[in-house]
């Protein structure tokens, strides 16, 4: 929480929602972020909690809504305004996504049906975020790990130790994170769809590198 406290103090409008694992499903953490009007969406997997028990008790009696997420067929349950967690300073919403999809096995080329069951607790109201968006936010926590950190290692050499000294290693990582965020903000917010068409992120990264080298080294781009 110390890191979040520093971030909120320095950049109070940088974010509105925190995504977290079930480890952070605690009343002090919820209340800490509710105070500066931030929202949370946290994995709910502790079957001993009253919040989980109350939601689970309604799964068999309330029909789910059908939805999709990519190639997956989903059944969604959405229970807003639950008061099963009085230690939290507001009502909590529980969202469940039961997902089914098929995978073709490489060995025998047969299709195998896969399922996954996700439950989240969130402070976002139904008016603020639809069920589909809440499910999408819940899965984005894994996207950060599977895509962002994966890309940082494979494309940005973030796992390479340029100088084996703690402060230097921290600085290199922070600069890598900053460069990664700036580049992806440029890709997502500045480039128009027409400019992206037929190109890749690597193409634009190469152009940016060429521009930076051209400015740093006089005559770099000269014929």
Where are these regions (language model features)?
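Non-catalytic, well-ordered alpha-helical scaffold segments
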Residues: 118, 132, 146, 169-176
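Generic secondary-structure signature for well-ordered alpha-helical cores
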Residues: 9, 60, 64, 183-187, ...
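Short, conserved catalytic/metal-binding motifs centered on acidic residues
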Residues: 17-23, 40, 120, 144-149, ...
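A short acidic (Asp/Glu
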Residues: 27-31, 52-54
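Short amphipathic alpha-helical "interface-anchor" segments enriched in bulky aromatics
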Residues: 128-163
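A short, flexible helix-boundary coil/loop motif
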Residues: 74, 80-83, 153-223
């Amino acid at each position: 929480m110390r890191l979040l406290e520093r971030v909120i103090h320095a950049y109070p409008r940088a974010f509105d929602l925190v995504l977290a694992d079930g480890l952070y499903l605690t009343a002090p953490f919820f209340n800490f972020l509710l105070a500066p009007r931030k929202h949370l969406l946290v994995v709910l997997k502790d079957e001993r909690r009253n919040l989980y028990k109350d939601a689970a008790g309604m799964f068999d009696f309330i029909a789910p809504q059908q939805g999709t997420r990519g190639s997956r067929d989903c059944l969604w349950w959405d229970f807003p305004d639950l008061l099963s967690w009085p230690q939290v300073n507001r009502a909590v919403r529980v969202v469940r996504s039961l997902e089914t999809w098929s995978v073709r096995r490489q060995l025998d080329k047969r299709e195998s049906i896969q399922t996954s069951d996700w439950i989240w607790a969130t402070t976002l109201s139904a008016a603020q975020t639809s069920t589909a968006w809440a499910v999408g936010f819940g899965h984005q926590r894994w996207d950060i790990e599977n895509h962002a950190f994966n890309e940082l290692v494979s494309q940005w050499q973030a796992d390479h130790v340029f100088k084996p000294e703690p402060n230097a290693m921290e600085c290199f990582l922070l600069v890598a994170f900053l460069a990664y965020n700036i580049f992806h903000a440029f890709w997502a917010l500045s480039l128009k769809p027409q400019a992206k068409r037929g190109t890749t992120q690597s193409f634009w990264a190469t152009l940016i590198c060429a521009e930076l080298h051209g400015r740093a080294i006089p005559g770099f781009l000269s014929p």
